[in-house]
Curated annotation (Swiss-Prot):
SUPFAM superfamilies: Chelatase. GO terms for molecular function: ferrochelatase activity; metal ion binding. This is Ferrochelatase. It holds the Pfam family Ferrochelatase. Belongs to the ferrochelatase family. It is found in: Cytoplasm. Catalyzes the ferrous insertion into protoporphyrin IX.
Length: 317
């Protein structure tokens, strides 16, 4: 069993910010002003752990795929070694905008003799601006190979019961810390996308809403809101409401506390640490709101079990 696990990627050092964002901007170098702002954001959070988390996800996913326990015997007569029902599993990491790139990962897979694999992005919602672009990069990499690799795609998993349970457990931790639950709002966030993508029928907002709805139902929340964050610096309109705008609305409606969960971001990275923990938190303090964020899934085993389930279900029989 072979797996290509993909994530966005992040620079490791300040000098890598420029080539990283040049790649995001499809070869267009950021202006000096924008570059300075981006560098200051990374400096403010210290460092984005996204690459390390993605690697940990891959290591743990490979371990789970290879260490499936046999059925429990009626009588324990001795050690029962783990078994790998589909043969040894290998999980490769490819990042969209840094190293190892998706192209580098696909080339390594081919060199290792891989001819079929499951492709999955460490993000639960499909979008023309996310998963579809990962797929384009894989397709471009395949064109450079002398022989093809047959990829089976896991394109979204917004309603997977294990994912919902994992998110619900972490939000419940925040609920227990609320001082006045009757005056608390529950907000689920995801990365914004251009409205032009939504107008083309992008299922992304529906999938984000579905995840939020299922978590709220599992926890019997009386109400919930969906907000978007981290909109791009482009003239075109982006999907809203923005988290900071929503916080102002919630204050006007009389809420005192806000429990936030970033359901669009399983792993900690710049847009969690800066856009939520610094920027949104500053907005909340300015408004007199108490904001608490649920911890991320990262490489925790309950999330890795979700990835394992998805990979095994997709693997060709």
């Amino acid at each position: 069993m072979n797996v290509l696990l993909m994530a966005y990627g992040t620079p490791y050092a300040p000098e890598e910010v420029e080539p990283y964002y040049t790649d995001i901007r499809r070869g267009r170098r950021p202006s000096e002003e924008l570059l300075k702002e981006l560098a200051e954001r990374y400096e403010a959070i210290g460092k984005s752990p996204l690459n390390e988390i993605t690697l940990a996800q891959a290591v743990r996913l490979q371990a789970l795929l290879n260490l499936e326990a046999p059925p429990y015997p009626k009588r324990l007569l001795g050690p029962f070694p783990p078994r790998a029902p589909h043969g040894p599993a290998r999980v490769y990491v490819g990042t969209k905008h840094w190293h190892p790139s998706i192209g580098e990962a696909v080339a390594a897979m081919h060199e290792d003799g891989v001819r079929r694999a499951v492709a999955i992005v460490a993000a639960p919602h499909y979008s023309l601006r996310s998963v579809a672009e990962y797929r384009e990069k894989v397709d471009s990499a395949l064109k450079t190979l002398p022989e093809p690799i047959d990829f089976v795609w896991v394109e979204s998993y917004e309603a997977h019961p294990g994912l919902i349970a994992a998110y619900a457990r972490r939000l419940e931790e925040v609920i227990w810390r609320l001082k006045n639950p009757g005056k608390a709002a529950y907000v689920f966030t995801a990365h914004s996308i251009p409205l032009s993508a939504v107008e083309k029928g992008d299922p992304y907002p529906r999938q984000v809403e579905k995840t939020a709805e299922l978590i709220a139902k599992k926890l019997a929340l009386p109400r919930f809101h969906v907000a978007y964050q981290s909109a791009g610096r482009t003239p075109e309109p982006w999907l809203g409401p923005d988290i900071n705008e929503l916080l102002r609305t919630l204050k006007e409606e009389g809420y005192e506390e806000v429990a936030v969960q970033a359901v669009g971001f399983p792993a900690d990275h710049l847009e969690v640490f800066y856009d939520l923990d610094l920027e949104a938190q500053a907005t909340a303090r300015e408004l007199g709101l108490r904001l608490l964020r649920a911890r991320s899934l990262n490489a925790d085993l309950d999330y890795i079990q979700v990835l394992k389930d998805l990979v095994e279900a997709a693997w060709p029989r």
